[in-house]
A protein has these predicted regions:
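Surface/interface-facing alpha-helical segments and adjacent flexible terminal/loop regions used
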Residues: 1-148
Length: 149
């Protein structure tokens, strides 16, 4: 997989984890055989065998169940001394973004923390597009270390 494909996959996953897909996005996926080949035979079959309305309903149910009702796709939930989720500069992920020129504004989004998986995948997409392999590895290493603590 080349960097363009990797960046596309990171961008797609960032979108999927941030909100339910719009009917337009579902139609784009349904009409993109190369992408369906990339994400697998079962996904291709699911998109080929269902119309846009059924796909919208099924994917909305899955998104709501997986990411809103049962849990949020937040990787580590960094908490402070009061056990509240750290959303600003006290969150080490936010500091890593800032140190590496990746600015996010959580005020205009439903994503609550900088370590939301959609934001992390968007960051990885930017790193792939910049071809900064060292920073990609540093980010993944630091995230792995934080999960072990």
């Amino acid at each position: 997989m080349d960097n363009t494909q990797r960046a596309f996959v990171y961008g797609f996953l960032s979108t999927v984890f941030s909100d339910k897909l719009s009917k337009e996005s579902i139609a784009d996926i349904k009409n993109n055989p190369n992408f369906l080949d990339l994400i697998g035979e079962n996904a291709r079959r699911f998109f080929d065998e269902n119309d846009i309305d059924v796909l919208d309903e099924e994917l909305n149910i899955d998104f709501t169940s997986a990411f809103l009702v049962n849990s949020h796709p937040v990787e580590s939930s960094v908490t402070d001394a009061k056990h509240q989720i750290s959303t600003g500069l006290e969150n080490p992920v936010m500091n890593f973004y800032i140190e590496n020129g990746f600015e996010i504004n959580l005020n205009n989004t439903n994503l609550l923390t900088p370590d939301h998986i959609a934001i992390e995948l968007g960051f990885m997409q930017n790193l792939v597009l910049s071809a900064d392999l060292k920073l990609q590895k540093d980010f993944m290493r630091k995230r792995s270390e934080e999960r072990r603590v």
